[in-house]
Amino acid sequence: MSTEDAAITVIGAGLAGSEAALAAARLGVRVRLHEMRPHKMTPAHRTGNFAELVCSTSLGGEGEMQAKGLLQAELRSVGGAIVGAADSSRVPAGNALAVDRDEFSARVTQAVRAHPLIEVVEGEVEAVPEGIGVIATGPLTSDALAADLARRTGSERLSFYDAAAPVIAFESINMDVAWRAGRYDQSADYINCPFTKEEYLRFFEALEQARRHTPHDWEQLEFFEGCMPIEELARRGVDTPRFGPMSPKGLDDPRTGRWPYAVAQLRQEDRAGRMWSLVGFQTGLKWGDQKVVVNLIPGLENAEIVRYGVMHRNTYLNAPEVLDATLQLRADPQKFVAGVLAGTEGYLESAATGWLAGTNAARLARGLTPLTPPPESMLGGLVRYLASANPKGFQPMNVNWALVPELPVPEGRRKLGKREKRPVLFQRGLNAFVAWAREEAGLPVTPPARPTAALATE
């Protein structure tokens, strides 16, 4: 197909859809962009503008100490529209990239509407159109389109709210306290953190006192018995958690040879074993309080939480079951999925997957092969995780350093600490992404200036 004839459809003009449309148009591909607002509003949006931020106004921490800082740098290097609009509408926020909400959305809307290759079609899309396209309809996907997606992918692969537990970096788990084992000597697929009675009561008291996130009126969360937040279980009584997800049955503590008073278990989240989630600890607690509670679990006293637990209305696919790392639907490779619907968490992550989906859709429309960024890059690490994570209980993921390969440790040398390691990971990832974008993807690249290391850490 010639460039003049190449065309794609994008559904949704949020951060992911707007970025996808502009990325494809920059490659000379015509785009038909569908957005149901303002004709049909969602409970969360105030305007009909594109890329409207409905919660926070921050796109995450900047600098080479931050995983989001690397993703920002990768997107800047290829002219990402969302991070460009954010840079132009930023407000003072320390080491974070925060924006003026209205100016940011107005800039994105202007860029989309002014582009000669983008046609904006206002109105609801009730079924995925034929041909090459990007689906980026976000957490409040309309009922009709959600039903069509469920039909295409299998209804059990489409979720309508988050119920996520905290995810811990393996290297921060104290394995002198915790141990690997399954119940009753089954395969050692879990990491177990044992409590004495005194430790459990301290943990329970902190759990009782922890502050809960207040849901938006439009979220209308209904908790199911099999997915009850840990704080809701605690409201039923001091022993409820330890007779539920924290049961010690069948787990002999190698230090004592006996079952502990209670146990917190962690399950492997990724193939490399870098990330482990707390089993049965789905929670809506405020993040600061989550950290306090998690650090009271024996073996997790210095735990690095790479993704906090959340409980909120959402619509997303079980990405490992339905998506490739190119963000193509396995059942229909002409369709790409981006943003929250693809299983990402966060504004920046939505924009980044929108950029890749739009770029790959444009490549496919031009007769080229869709690509995946290198694993050392943050975007490459994220999409590889989406395609290969444990599908059992899959929950949306934000970027973090556990998504990229560890640095090799030369023989006879010590392992680098966090503050030494992250700038090296940052530069390695950015170099790999820039080389990939220029040499493999054939894109114009402007490597951003080396950032000043931010003081804040993740």
Swiss-Prot record:
GO terms for molecular function: flavin adenine dinucleotide binding; tRNA (uracil(54)-C5)-methyltransferase activity, 5,10-methylenetetrahydrofolate-dependent. Signal peptide: none annotated. It holds the Pfam family GIDA. Its cofactor is FAD. Its EC number is 2.1.1.74. The keyword Signal does not apply. FAD binds at residues 12-17. It is an enzyme of class 2 (transferase). Catalyzes the folate-dependent formation of 5-methyl-uridine at position 54 (M-5-U54) in all tRNAs. Belongs to the MnmG family. TrmFO subfamily. NCBIfam families: gid_trmFO, PRK05335.1. This is Methylenetetrahydrofolate--tRNA-(uracil-5-)-methyltransferase TrmFO. It comes from Deinococcus geothermalis (strain DSM 11300 / CIP 105573 / AG-3a).
